[in-house]
C-alpha cells in the first residue's frame, strides 16, 4: 500500500510540473506575440515616416533643382562671412553679401572660386570649375593638333632649337639632370607673319604627350578690373595641374609691350597683366615640367623684363625663307596636289620676290582654285602663274578671276 501511495504522489507531482511548464510557455508566447504586435506597429510607423521623408526629400530636390535652373549669374567668391553667408562679386562688377545654399560643399568655397548665383535673389547656389568662366581650353591627347614636323617645309634650325628647348625636357628630363643644367623655361618665337611660328608650336604639341594650352595675348585683356591677371593665374594653374604641359601664348605683344607711365586705366590694367605674367614665370618650379612658348611679329616692342634669361631662355628667329627653304616649302605643300608635268616649281623658287610660308601656301591654294574654276582636275602652269600674281598682288589689273 505504501508503494502505491508513493507512485500516486509522484504522478501528481509530475502533472503539476507539466502544468506549470505549459503555463510558462503560454506566458512567453503571449509576451512574444505582444512584442511582435508592437514591432509591427513600429514597422508601419517607420514605413509611414519613410514615405513622408522621401516625399519631403523629392520636394527639396525639386526646389534645389529649380533654384539651380539656368540661366544663372557667374560670380567670384571674395570671402566667407560665416558658414551660411559670403561676399561675392558678380560679372556686372557689383559686390554682394549673399546667402549660401546649404547643400554646397564648404570645402570648395575658397577665395577667388568661381560660383553660380541665383538670378533673382543672387544666392550662391553652386560652385563652378575654375576654368568654366574663361576662354582657356586644355587640349587633351585626343585633341592634339594634327600638324607634324614633316608638314613644315624647311626650318631645320628652328625645328632643332625648338626640340631642344621644349620637346626634350618633356620627354627626356633626366638627360638635363645628368648633365647638371636646367632646361629652358620659356621660348620666344619671333619673325615676320606667315613664317611658321604657330605651326611649329602645334607640331611640338603633336609630338609630345604633354597637355597643350593655347591662348592669344588679347584674350587676357578683359572688361573688368582684375580679370586679366586672374586669367593669367588660371592658365598657369591649369598647366601645373595637368603637367607635363605646354602653354602657347600667341601674339604676346598684345600684353607685353615695354612699360611706360600709363595715363589711362586700360593701359594700367595691361601692365598689371604683364606683371602677373612675369610673376607666374618667376614662380615656376623647373621640376613641374611646364613649358611656355610665346610668339610675336614685333619682338622689338616687348618689355626687357620678359626677355631676360630665366624667363625666356631661348629666342628663335623665323626669317623669310631663302631659296632652299622656299623649294622645300613648295615641295611639302604640292606633295598632295595633282600637278601637271609641265609645272616647274623651280621657276617660282628662283624668283626674287620675298615670300613667307603662308604666301607660298596661298599661291598653291589659288592655283588649285583656278583649276577648279576651269573645271579641271589637273593644275597647269598658267594656274600657278595666276595664283602667284593674285597672292603677291604684283599686277592688280589681272585680278579678274573669271577670265
From Swiss-Prot:
The keyword Transcription does not apply. Its main location: cytoplasm. One of its GO terms (molecular function) is ATP binding. Gene3D superfamilies: 1.10.8.60, Nucleic acid-binding proteins, P-loop containing nucleotide triphosphate hydrolases. ATP binds at residues 191-198. One of its GO terms (biological process) is proteasome-mediated ubiquitin-dependent protein catabolic process. Keywords: Acetylation, ATP-binding, Cytoplasm, Nucleotide-binding, Nucleus, Proteasome. InterPro entries: 26S_Proteasome_ATPase, AAA+_ATPase, AAA_lid_3, ATPase_AAA_core, ATPase_AAA_CS, NA-bd_OB-fold, P-loop_NTPase, Prot_ATP_ID_OB_2nd. It comes from the Eukaryota. SUPFAM superfamilies: P-loop containing nucleoside triphosphate hydrolases. The modification N-acetylmethionine is found at residue 1. One of its GO terms (cellular component) is proteasome regulatory particle. It holds the Pfam family AAA. This is 26S proteasome regulatory subunit 6B homolog. It comes from Dictyostelium discoideum (Social amoeba). The lineage of its organism: Eukaryota, Amoebozoa, Evosea, Eumycetozoa, Dictyostelia.
